[in-house]
């Protein structure tokens, strides 16, 4: 053979291994498969047949017509492997060739076998003859270039063996390849003269294997509709979450309801089956609603991508014939250009739903074969083509493919894909069909902060392209369990990164086959990254690319065809294109009516049936995950180059990134002549300027037509477009050209839409610009010198992935910030830098703080010595140690004042881990050295009136080391109280052997975040011996002192002029914070980088919060408090002290203003405030009445510079100090910081914003606050995404879901107050609620201006304070009393101001000019404003005692008021007493030798209460926590003795399960002796009759209570060894559950509920039972039954309130508090005082028993009855307890309460005297005695109000009523005795009775009646699951008991008596007498 020297392409057989090429093998080996057969032809003919068959086989598997392979002849076989040669043979043939002509042309070259390496051009070989020597060598040479060898042994029965390398071909493929080869060889030998094209290549064995692989595919589609499957989920799980989106969540029930509205609207407009409705939405939950609404209407939908050019959208809408389009409100304007009818969802749909007139067109339901949606893809004709997918196809695919993708009802699916791609439809609908949840990030989150959005939305299933997955970290999204990748091939590294952490699936599917056609499930680390898995839902067939009627053998490349029910209907309006790719009944498919889609993808099939993607056979390509039809781009581009040939191709540039290149055949005769042969593709060198001008114009035009990903990056002119031999564009040549371009050649033809745009920006030369360039280069893997100002980021190789990476990098440069949108919108690097710069501070901020301040120079120079002496005295140091003294900043003063009020507040605790080799002594020295250079660390704060009239001073102490405490690891950290005069910093060194820790404790008055970093830097520098920097704080204080107060006052006055803001929340007592009621909740917002250059994140957050407040107050004028870093002024950046400042921020929202304009205005506003931000709240408050209103803000917004941990973790402190997370401290710190009813703290992080809300739960519920945060999230996302939208549009789109906002406004708005007032006062009266500032006050008051025609203007012409006459005056007084005593959640007016209705405001159409009303009211004192209601007895009280007058003068001085303006009963907080004022007030009191703490001031509500506190300070201390069983030690000594004793009393319970035990109190024992086994119960009705109660949830809620309260797990048992004692034994868990009775009849429901639950003689069980009863109609009752006086009424009320909160999913109190045992311990100590019994002996001396006699015919039963009412019920003889109700309506409740308030009487006193009057009339006795129940909760025990147990007692109430005494005197006497009885209330009644009656042995009791005054056991005002008490029955040892329940407007008395005692008529008489007695007292009042 002759060697021929010409170039041919390599002929490399493809790898057919399903194992990873990187997987190592234990040894070198080869797979071998042999076969033999008998032949009758010559050996030469056989070998030629084998060679020819091998050629055909290689041609099929390499998809080539030029075949090259190696041959080893028989003579070479016996040689040594070093000498063996291989001849390379080449064959070229055509399908029309005759077989004899297809022979190897010649031997081209020879190779030494052992020299064959990886660079070989062939990898297959035929060996003819013996092969033993070199074959062994080949098997043991793993890197040999030959991978496949066919060995032929000649003979009568030729034997052939195929050897393959395991790393190259798996064993199954070897067998399949042998089968194919043998089949080809048989055909060749049988038809030696035939044509090549007639040779059948695919054997039947392969065909059968393919049939087996497709056998699981469904033959028929699922006959279902998408919306029907979703509707079933809605019915099955209506409350389950269907959508979790950035703009709100939606349950399945809500989704069903909202989509039904859309359906109704569409059907009303004639939309039905086969109608196509386009949808134009941004990422939103409403997209899902619109999609489902269209499907329900029977129509099909098309999702439009908002970012696409309008021309493309118009083309699609024209193609579908759109008449109606659904849009969001933001897209409505664009939508109006696309269809005749435009409707936004939800706004227009809700407003324009058709009325129910019965004329709606009949609904035609969609059928499974109707179109469900149309998905548009790129089209080769220049227009996108729409694929029609039917319901049946989509449902089949969803049901079949979901299991393979691990998609199910528990999946929370990320909706990431653009609406332009059908994957978005799969992500949206399939989860809903399965019962899962669709999670939708915003457009900004999707691009800028995807990882954070995934966490926030709790995504656990997502489908992404590999390019996007590279942005994510598996460790940072731990909730994600399944990742599906598709759209492009995944790299081996990316596959390995994910496969080890979560379930990784690879999905494949063209839009024509319903999204997902093939899945590679559960990919392992060693899986094939090119594999697209196996068919699911559709059958898989691989055919010859040019002939779909011929199947290729398994393993050979071919075009992928997908068949089955998932194949779409075809292309809309394109029958030719449909027929070309949607084929029917090919010859290899036996079944009829089978449809297949030709994907155009070239693939091959592995031996296990999986498919490997190889590429495309046509011009459709994938670029960055996007499917692109090159023909469409070419079609559109040709319009910009008329007459020129164009071609578009994708190729990899020099930097490895793919690029879209447009080639243009630039007509130039000169160049055409020079182009010929091999250089015909040479680019044009001349005429470049003209061409580039055209190229820029073309790119700009294409950007308006095509999506951005289809616009070419580079446009290149060519002499001619290269063509292939078939006269088609030679795309391979174009791709090769792209690959060969150098960097300079690429830059030569990069085109921008406006290449001159960079000229607008000057040359940049600076550190920040250079740093940004370095980051661009690093992201793009370039050298910085290659990045020039005019370069475009994307033309340098950037893409969306690198844009996100660059955005994150830029954010690390101070004062620079870039969003991804900024990068996309920047034409050049210069513009990129311009966009990244933040707005600098103006020069007007100069001058800054002074550089140096002399010691003591900020004090009065004449008093410096006095200052030093006093400071030394307060700090406990010598005067010589005082280094400096200067005032505190306003915030420091407030922080210390709050700490005085609440010890422990504002103290930071930080744990630092230390390395094991830390030098502790040196570290201690380093801290003290740092304190030398940071005076703030040596600073203490003092508060003394002698120095600064109560204004705190800070004292810098020298020669005092930082307090340093060393403890062992096992010891607890010592607590040092920080207060005035004490050190405010100390360190605790824990010298643990293996984990040493340093704990830093420091008060916030000393540091902020900047100072914290300064401290750590200074300690590190000192430890390392480096120089330190002096950082004083006094210069900043001087700056604050030197602020021009007049300018500041003028500024703040101007700032709040005309303020119309409504305080939020409208709490009842403004300014009074209840720390025990503070709760918190947290929400994380996914936060993209803001896309407004120069706008700070703070401005964005402030705007969003202002919009939230606007939504909740209904006002566009909002005010809230804000705390800032205070380091905006020059020189403040490095100040060594806390500079944070708080001030009220006012923001007015303007509906016509764009978001961009509003942000800029807010930012400029913040800059204007900066010079005055240190003014302090107290100074701002005094600048004007409006300023005072602004300073009374009820909500605070705090924006941290960053999360403390995330910042500090980045500090270079290792290995000295490593900060540990101390989340619990942060939470407690913010709780202590919560001085307002609502405090919102924002902590920005990397791509997210953590927002915590701390709120007073007595004012706001958790649900309300969470809704506000969700509203804030929605608004912030809208602000970020739509900067050009108007404020009005954004506000209208951010309404709270499900009407929650409306409900809140209804509950809190001033409108409700005005409405109720009008209803109360009747017709002819007008009302307006206005916030005013009365004269001599600085606290806003809510006033109710009332206008009526009957009012007359006062004589001096003032238009307010009109004369008020009866009956209006009485109605006004009653109304105010009702509002103030029964707030019911509304805003509560402080005063009422009558106004004549004839008054005409300056603004027409309004009853009242609010501005003028505020101004007029400010001229009068509060006393004057309320003078109209005075009738000789004013509610304003002057001091009665000298002490009260002293306190009033002190407070008046602090508040700058006249003493006469303050009443001794005025609320202190309402007067303006905040923490700082309280501190100053305490200092003034100290000046008068009155020692008051700030806590005492706030505990008192008025000066009178404060005077009472001073007169008698509480003696009790809070009860310390007790050890378990501690109270039993006096009785048993140890626990074992207790268990042995008590086990005998327990029936069936293991006493070792107890966790505590303690004895009963003496008071409880006294009750037990009388009550015996008396039982009580209360029955409630739950909810409304229409409300269905979930009994399972209700029972679980009660068991939750049982776990929370030890009392509900407590046995009450008698002690065997001490018979007089009973014990409480607390179990670890409850042994009894909840009794649930269902399916009862309504008529018998209450009767069955009354049946007893507890046995009367059983011991050892729980002393209570809880049961729930429900009727068949849903009416629900619950019952609590108890005995042994186990629970008092107050405990039942506590339990019911907590049960309601649990059912309403609201937080409850701390489960560790309170403890009933602590109350028992207190009482045992209390009982040791003998004075208590001595009081009762003295108080009841001479008393005769007061016994109400039984009815005449009941006398003989009375004694018998008393013996029976504790006995068992036998034979029906047990006495019955009868209860009768008598509702007593107090006609003038206002007068009664006023009478009580004026004389310091209580309602209980009134009722006791009334019962005494009743007994006097019934018995004729004047010395009355009866039992009176007391709650027992007015003791100094922590949280006694929430203790559950038996705290009550029955006291002997003695009231002497001689005829000479008036009722008033009796009331006053009894009120005094009530206080004395309360001081001794815990004595056992049994002991008291025995003590008093010791001289009367014939008497057994002091009385037989009892009075109980209680709060209602159900609160009708409560929201949520209401409990309405139906009946309460309490068995008692008394013959008759009166239970009076006091409601705000009535008193309801129930009289209970034993059947043996009296009859109903007698009971009615007693009740009537009691009612008359109450009325008699009221008349006397």
UniProtKB/Swiss-Prot annotation:
InterPro entries xrefs: AA_adenyl_dom, ACP-like_sf, AMP-bd_C_sf, AMP-binding_CS, AMP-dep_synth/lig_dom, ANL_N_sf, CAT-like_dom_sf, Condensatn
Catalytic activity: 2 L-tryptophan = cyclo(L-Trp-L-Trp) + 2 H2O
Spans annotated as Adenylation: 251-638
EC code: 6.3.2.-
Positions carrying O-(pantetheine 4'-phosphoryl)serine: 800, 1475
Pfam families registered for this protein in UniProt: AMP-binding, Condensation, PP-binding
Top-rank EC class of the record's enzyme: ligase
Names of the cofactor(s): pantetheine 4'-phosphate
A GO cellular-component term linked to this record: cytoplasm
GO molecular function terms listed in the Swiss-Prot or TrEMBL record: ligase activity; phosphopantetheine binding
Domain Carrier: start-end pairs: 763-840, 1438-1514
GO biological process, one term: secondary metabolite biosynthetic process
Key words of the record: Ligase, Phosphopantetheine, Phosphoprotein, Repeat
Pathway the protein acts in: Alkaloid biosynthesis
Region of interest: Condensation 1: 883-1293, 1586-1978
PANTHER family xref list: NONRIBOSOMAL PEPTIDE SYNTHASE ATNA-RELATED, NONRIBOSOMAL PEPTIDE SYNTHETASE
Functional summary from the UniProt entry: Nonribosomal peptide synthetase; part of the gene cluster that mediates the biosynthesis of okaramine B, a prenylated indole alkaloid that possesses an unusual octacyclic ring system, including a four-membered azetidine ring and an eight-membered azocine ring, and that exhibits insecticidal activity against silkworm larvae. Within the pathway, okaA acts as a bimodular non-ribosomal peptide synthetase (NRPS) that condenses two tryptophan molecules into cyclo(L-Trp-L-Trp).
This protein's domain notes: NRP synthetases are composed of discrete domains (adenylation (A), thiolation (T) or peptidyl carrier protein (PCP) and condensation (C) domains) which when grouped together are referred to as a single module. Each module is responsible for the recognition (via the A domain) and incorporation of a single amino acid into the growing peptide product. Thus, an NRP synthetase is generally composed of one or more modules and can terminate in a thioesterase domain (TE) that releases the newly synthesized peptide from the enzym.
Name of the protein this chain belongs to: Nonribosomal peptide synthetase rstn8
Naturally occurring in which organism (per UniProt): Penicillium ochrochloron
Highest classification ranks of the organism: Eukaryota, Fungi, Dikarya, Ascomycota, Pezizomycotina
